[in-house]
Amino acid sequence: RICTNCCAGRKGCNYYSADGTFICEGESDPNNPKACPRYCDTRIAYSKCPRSEGN
């Protein structure tokens, strides 16, 4: 289980609950991070990042 929230999540990454329900897309650009609260959205279990560079 990852610890993040929609605001702090990486832009271009989709966040899902444990049963595969889409929750949100991340809003924070790695090159220009948003000022986000550091809390864990307990609904978020994993992410998929189809548009991220690298992996």
Swiss-Prot record:
Organism superkingdom: Eukaryota
InterPro entries: Prot_inh_I20, Protease_inhibitor_I20
Gene Ontology CC terms, in alphabetical order: extracellular region
Pfam families xref list: Prot_inhib_II
Gene3D superfamilies: 3.30.60.30
Site-annotated residues for Reactive bond for trypsin: 38-39
Family: Belongs to the protease inhibitor I20 (potato type II proteinase inhibitor) family.
Protein purpose: Potent inhibitor of trypsin and a weaker inhibitor of chymotrypsin and pronase E.
Protein name as it appears in the record: Proteinase inhibitor PSI-1.1
Species, as recorded: Capsicum annuum
